[in-house]
Amino acid sequence: MSSVSVNHRHEILLLPRHKRNTQTVIAGESAAIDEAVAKFAEMGKRAVKLAVSAAFHTKLMAGAAEKFKGEIAGFPFKAPNCDFYSNLYGRKLDDFSDMPSYLAAHICSPVKFVDELSAMQSAGIEAYVELGPGKVLTGLVKKFDRGANAMHIENAETLEKALAALKG
């Protein structure tokens, strides 16, 4: 465990995400992040500043979350036809009655990725598929469980590979 003190001139430095048992993402004002990264380096700890456009998953995004919620308020959401696991709550999601609030909360709330994976593993989930560009989450799943059947889909080629792997 590490403890880092940063200068109090920065208003916000939060620990919003637990990606895996050995990795925590800090978020907040850019200057506070820079100072924390420097402090970790002084301690001989690895710290990498992520290239992100905003302080997602922190209260700094509350205004954007409210605006987003208003924009999607009239969208006709439907409950999925399969189990849906939430990294907002770290468990299976059963209540789909207020999806605008749920989705807006993702913008300014911590991500409980390890809790979500633990819940999925406990439920007997055996395959994990990441949709979209890149393989960040696929890699994190494999670090969480080295034997996990984790794959990503970002185009027609990777879709074919994933379907073949899922069919066995």
Locate the predicted segments by residue:
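Flexible, low-complexity segments
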Residues: 105-168
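Alpha/beta catalytic cores of group-transfer enzymes, especially the acyltransferase/condensing modules
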Residues: 1-110, 163-166
